[in-house]
């Protein structure tokens, strides 16, 4: 967890001072989502959590910075595992809607209370949360995700209900055909 936090902090700092170059390229989101999801299979299995992929068979093409998009998906899946209960599922899905590729990561964890929902995704607030194995979360990874998604022409949002899990989603524009 510490290496991920340090990596996020470094990327966030570089991004905020304009030292992180965005390199756009044509990418197949199906391959990216599947590849990043598979990386977490072993980590999830340590908590007896199953990662379920719901992705289309056909190519979902976008023009984006692949490293940024992978970082976003990694952070969302890592958080979902952190906040999910043992023996549950994390669902990673990809869909096309209104000219956008939509990636969603749904957990079956504790959810986020209304007060912390208001604080999430804002740089001027701070709070700590704890995962199901007492792993601490600072919110920095989500700020980085939001920043990277915006730099790729999309947006990040979430739905959550205390006691009923959370779904974090982001959109990026599809490659024009």
Language-model region placement:
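Helix-loop junction within the histidine kinase core
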Residues: 13-24
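Conserved catalytic submotifs in the C-terminal HATPase_c
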Residues: 23-28, 34, 45, 50-60
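Short helix-loop "hinge" at the ATP-lid/N-box region of the Bergerat-fold HATPase_c
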Residues: 80-81
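Short conserved segment of the HATPase_c
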Residues: 112-126
């Amino acid at each position: 967890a510490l290496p991920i936090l340090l990596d996020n902090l470094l990327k966030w700092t570089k991004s905020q001072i304009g030292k992180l170059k965005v390199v756009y390229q044509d990418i197949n989101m199906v391959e990216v989502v599947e590849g990043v999801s598979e990386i977490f299979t072993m980590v999830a299995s340590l908590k007896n959590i199953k990662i379920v992929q719901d992705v289309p068979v056909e190519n979902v093409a976008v023009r984006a910075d692949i490293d940024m998009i992978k970082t976003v998906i990694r952070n969302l899946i890592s958080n979902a595992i952190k906040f999910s209960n043992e023996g549950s599922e994390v669902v990673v899905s990809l869909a096309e809607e209104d000219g956008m590729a939509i990636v969603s990561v749904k957990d079956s964890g504790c959810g986020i209370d209304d007060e912390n929902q208001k604080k999430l995704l804002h740089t001027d607030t701070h709070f700590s949360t704890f995962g199901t194995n007492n792993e601490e979360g600072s919110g920095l990874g989500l700020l980085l995700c939001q920043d990277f998604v915006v730099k790729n022409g999309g947006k990040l949002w979430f739905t959550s209900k205390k006691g009923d899990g959370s779904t974090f989603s982001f959109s990026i524009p599809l490659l024009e055909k």
